[in-house]
Design a protein with these regions (language model features):
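Alpha-helical repeat scaffolds
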Residues: 151-153, 182-199, 222-245, 271-293, ...
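Residue at a conserved register position within TPR or TPR-like alpha-solenoid repeats
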Residues: 266, 311, 357, 391, ...
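Long, ordered, amphipathic alpha-helical scaffolds
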Residues: 426-513
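Structural motif corresponding to the intra-repeat A-B loop/turn of tetratricopeptide repeats
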Residues: 360, 394, 431-434
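Thioredoxin-like thiol-disulfide oxidoreductase module
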Residues: 39-47, 70-127, 133-141
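Generic helix N-cap/helix-start motif at coil->alpha-helix transitions
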Residues: 161-167, 201-212, 246-262, 293-312, ...
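Conserved redox-active cysteine motifs that mediate thiol-disulfide chemistry
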Residues: 57-71
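Charged, amphipathic alpha-helical linkers/stalks
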Residues: 130-188
Length: 513
């Protein structure tokens, strides 16, 4: 986490107003009154009332955010839980939101922070948790010794962490803050020492930490001494979270989404027997996750993803088993569609259901599901984007472009609009299309009109969208008319505040070089 002094200095560059925080989202708990003033006002209130600041960073359209609302915010007990905090909802499309995102070092939706009135971070959660998991972690952060992440990490490595600190180390997110290089040899070694010190009775905490360590290791391509050592101990770490129903439940995110790269990383050609044994354990664990009624509809549906992953691992010899897998996935998506009754559940479930259908080549059913949902959703652009990708996958270029355009034109919210416009440009660049140059020119005009109309257009997620755009356009031959337009926009950089001015100039320099 950046120093408090730096955060306060940067925050003084903007003058947050009451519009910093949007009004109540109708999908949030009706029992809880979210803070309606500026972010700074929330910290002032927390100091005055001797409370903490509970800050939720999200977007109304994002599926994981809606799962969080279904699992946690909508629960009757949530409002009571928040009595020790000032609850703040920072929507990524609200005024100054992306500047605040950088100050607080949050980017991915959703992220939950628990902060002192001096902005010291006590908790960060980005994973999907049940209400009970969330409540226990939150209460540990509130009632504990108020140590930060680095202090907890060192306490764990030295074997002096308290039970509350162990829980926060396990359930708290390690990503997106504190400038940690989770893939460095030093950090891998620290994490191995940390896991070795977890008390025997804390099986759940050890399971989560072990699963996250293997996930990080599987993302590494180098072959250092510590990586080789970790690979030789992979089975031990797998045992930590595949050993029981309790540990499987705790490490479900890794089990669902990350086991394929873990197994490929851990086991070479001479270890096929143990790899196959581990794969069977993986599939058995996924089956248990699917049968957990405490989990959200979305998580139980994604419990079928390992079945798809193992099918794809065995291609082409597994092709004969596709019809059987299609039946399983179809039945699962129908059940999820039926079970997801609230708006936030549907926003969390439907795009994932369509993705799983597409992965087993049930393209028509996936398209039908997405089209049906787009017609009744207040966020149709999310489904149109999925439709665009689906049609591109099955080779219908025209439909792919039509849905991509529908997505970008129906998108709302300042940062969201930029993100979807850039996606549409990317689709045009990567796909054969008539009058491509003219369409791209028109979309670029929309992007820059949006960017320069915003006070945080060169910050946070909006700036990340611009960096993706720079990369696309740096290798794309712009026509003279479009180049002239971009040079005109680049002249507006000098009107921005200093940091945005530098980023703006760098952006156009990359494109127009």
């Amino acid at each position: 986490m950046r120093s408090i002094a730096l955060m306060l200095a940067l925050s003084s560059c903007v003058t947050p107003s009451s519009s910093d925080t949007p009004h109540d989202d109708p999908y949030h708990s009706t029992a809880l009154k979210w803070h309606q003033g500026s972010i700074e006002d929330a910290f002032k209130q927390a100091k005055k009332e001797r409370k903490l600041v509970f800050l939720y960073w999200g977007a109304k359209w994002c599926p994981p955010c809606n799962e969080l609302k279904a699992q946690v915010f909508s629960q009757p007990r949530f409002a009571e839980l928040m009595t020790s905090s000032v609850p703040v909802y920072l929507d990524g499309d609200s005024e100054y939101a992306q500047i605040w995102g950088e100050l607080l070092q949050v980017s991915g939706y959703p992220t939950i922070l628990l902060l002192t009135d001096e902005k010291k971070e006590l908790m960060r959660i980005s994973e999907s948790l049940t209400y009970d998991e969330f409540a226990a972690t939150y209460l540990d952060a509130v009632s504990g010794d108020h140590t930060g992440f680095s202090e907890r990490l060192e306490a764990g490595i030295s074997g002096k962490a308290t039970p509350q600190q162990w829980r926060l180390l396990a359930y708290g997110s390690w990503y997106g803050t504190r400038n940690l290089d989770l893939h460095s040899d030093l950090m891998l070694e620290k994490r191995m020492k940390l896991i070795a010190n977890v008390p025997t009775r804390l099986k759940v905490e050890k399971a989560i930490l072990s699963a996250e360590l293997l996930k990080s290791a599987a993302e590494i391509s180098r072959d250092s001494a510590i990586v080789r050592k970790l690979r030789t101990q992979a089975v031990k770490y797998l045992d930590s979270f595949l050993d029981s129903d309790e540990t499987i439940f705790a490490a479900r995110t890794t089990i669902i989404y990350s086991m394929k790269p873990i197994l490929n990383w851990a086991f070479g050609k001479n270890q096929q027997t143990i790899k196959e044994q581990s794969r069977k354990r993986w599939l058995a664990a996924a089956e248990k996750i699917r049968g957990k009624p405490e989990l959200s509809v979305d998580t139980r549906l994604w419990g079928w993803y390992p079945e798809i992953e193992t099918y794809e691992m065995d291609l082409p010899k597994s092709k004969a088993s596709l019809p059987e897998l299609q039946v399983k996935v179809r039945d699962a998506t129908i059940a999820a569609d039926s079970s997801a009754t609230s708006d936030f559940e549907r926003q969390a479930v439907i795009s994932g259901a369509a993705h799983l259908l597409g992965r087993v080549e049930l393209y028509d059913e996936a398209a039908e599901l997405l089209l049906r949902e787009a017609k009744k959703s207040v966020y149709p652009y999310y489904y149109y984007s999925s439709l665009s990708q689906l049609e591109k996958k099955r080779g219908d270029t025209n439909k792919s472009l039509v849905y991509s355009k529908k997505a970008s034109q129906s998108a709302t919210g300042k940062s969201t609009k930029i993100q979807w416009l850039v996606q549409d440009i990317n689709m045009l660049i990567s796909t054969p299309a008539a009058d491509k140059a003219q369409q791209i020119s028109g979309l670029l005009e929309q992007v820059y009109n949006q960017i320069f109309a915003q006070k945080d257009g060169f910050s946070g997620r909006s700036y990340r969208s611009l960096k993706r755009l720079s990369k696309m356009l740096s290798s794309y031959p712009l026509d003279s008319t479009t180049s002239k337009k971009l040079k005109g926009y680049s002249l507006r950089c000098s009107r921005l505040e200093k940091r945005a001015q530098v980023r703006c100039s760098d952006h156009f320099s990359e494109i127009l070089k």
